[in-house]
Amino acid sequence: MPVKIVLLGPPGAGKGTQAKSISNRYSIPHISTGDIFRKNISENTPLGIEAKSYMDNGQLVPDEVTINMVKDRLQQDDCKNGYLLDGFPRTVHQAEALDNFLTEREESIDTALLIEVPKEFILERMTGRRVCPSCGASYHIKFNPPTNDGKCDLCGSDVIQRKDDTEETVKERLDVYENQTQPLIDFYKNKKQLSVVDGTQAINEVFESICKILGSDK
């Protein structure tokens, strides 16, 4: 039975890791809006050309362009047995457009899967990340610190905190997520399509919780 999933969750919730595991377990494509944009732009599709013209002018790509890209992607053969949408929909307008498109095809989303993680937990998780600028090795000052304080275990370079991981930046991203996504969460809750998973668990436990929701008979 096909399984169609919308994946929701704040930055730092581990969506990418879980998306990969879900895709493998259920043999469905992991569809991210970033990948769709890059593919359309690199292949110079009409939608890609239109999107690029907005981006080149420093403008936001209109919802309709994004929606049409997603519609095209969902009609490809590898989506016949379901798919995992990551990064779409971002707004209630996009969710309604997706609903209308699926209704026309006599289909619907099976679940909107929310990986829920408290803000304090994400702040600790993201602001503690460190990376080696020389070899790319990743660390965490609490959960996976380098053996020698501040030095990469592999090459000895000083590890750094990326700009994206500073407390100010993380808080800004979380505020944007909250303001943008709460109406979307309410939308799926009202449609009784929302499933919530505790994202503070260990990675394998989060995945086990997801499988219980989706059914693990694949």
From Swiss-Prot:
Its EC number is 2.7.4.3. It is an enzyme of class 2 (transferase). GO terms for biological process: AMP salvage. PROSITE patterns: ADENYLATE_KINASE. One of its GO terms (molecular function) is ATP binding. It catalyses: AMP + ATP = 2 ADP. Keywords: ATP-binding, Cytoplasm, Kinase, Metal-binding, Nucleotide biosynthesis, Nucleotide-binding, Transferase, Zinc. InterPro entries: Adenyl_kin_sub, Adenylat/UMP-CMP_kin, Adenylat_kinase_CS, Adenylate_kinase_lid-dom, P-loop_NTPase. AMP binds at residues 33, 38, 59-61, 87-90, 94, 162, 173. Residues 128-165 are annotated as: LID. Monomer. Belongs to the adenylate kinase family. Catalyzes the reversible transfer of the terminal phosphate group between ATP and AMP. Plays an important role in cellular energy homeostasis and in adenine nucleotide metabolism. This is Adenylate kinase. It comes from Clostridium perfringens (strain 13 / Type A).
